[in-house]
Amino acid sequence: MRIFGYARVSTSQQSLDIQIRAVKDAGVKANRIFTDKASGSSTDREGLDLLRMKVEEGDVILVKKLDRLGRDTADMIQLIKEFDAQGVAVRFIDDGISTDGDMGQMVVTILSAVAQAERRRILERTNEGRQEAKLKGIKFGRRRTVDRNVVLTLHQKGTGATEIAHQLSIARSTVYKILEDERAS
């Protein structure tokens, strides 16, 4: 029996360190830890794919938390079934559960459904917060790009930089930068 570890974060801004430390503390060797920095909504993850190829019957995979293996109930169940068919057990350190046996798989299925429901609630609250912010005039996303040709046309007509900035709702420094870039080219 070999013990492997798996860790995943959803974004590149998040850190894998805590999860890696947890599986190491549970006895997993560093060269047997597989990681991904990707959304759990997709099961096509490089680290997970390598782990799938590496494990054999009798092996155990340790994951810090249930939602680190997958975020969607169907995908989670599919992964657990796949590992089970290979004779590989998955154990979730923080949750204290394992896919060994029928009871373990039932608990995992229930917990993954609960985790999915919690994510939906979080998404609902996030969307409600965004809608409230929009009503208050808070804008989201990247600022719109400036049409350089409009700036240049207004300048050629004799409009000053301050007035151009005011008309286009952009910073005066942006107007100067566009004019400077035009002179340099």
From Swiss-Prot:
Keyword DNA-binding in the entry? The reply is: yes
| UniProt feature coiled coil, ranges | none
Q: What are the residue boundaries of the Resolvase/invertase-type recombinase catalytic domain, all occurrences included?
A: 2-137
The protein's UniProt keywords, in alphabetical order, are: DNA integration, DNA recombination, DNA-binding, Plasmid, Transposable element
In the UniProt entry, which residues are flagged as the active site?
10 (o-(5'-phospho-dna)-serine intermediate)
Alphabetized InterPro entries for the sequence: Homeodomain-like_sf (IPR009057), Recombinase_CS (IPR006118), Resolv_N (IPR006119), Resolvase-like_N_sf (IPR036162), Resolvase_HTH_dom (IPR006120), SSR_resolvase (IPR050639)
Q: Name one GO biological process term.
A: DNA integration
One Pfam family name is: HTH_7
The UniProt record lists the keyword Zinc: no
A Gene Ontology MF term for this entry? DNA binding
Residue range(s) of DNA binding per entry: 161-180
| Family annotation (SUPFAM superfamilies) | Homeodomain-like, Resolvase-like
- PROSITE patterns from the xrefs? RECOMBINASES_1, RECOMBINASES_2, RECOMBINASES_3
Role, per record:
Resolvase catalyzes the resolution (a site-specific recombination) of the cointegrated replicon to yield the final transposition products.
Per the record, the similarity remark reads: Belongs to the site-specific recombinase resolvase family.
Listed name of the protein: Transposon Tn1331 resolvase
Q: What is the species listed in this Swiss-Prot or TrEMBL entry?
A: Klebsiella pneumoniae
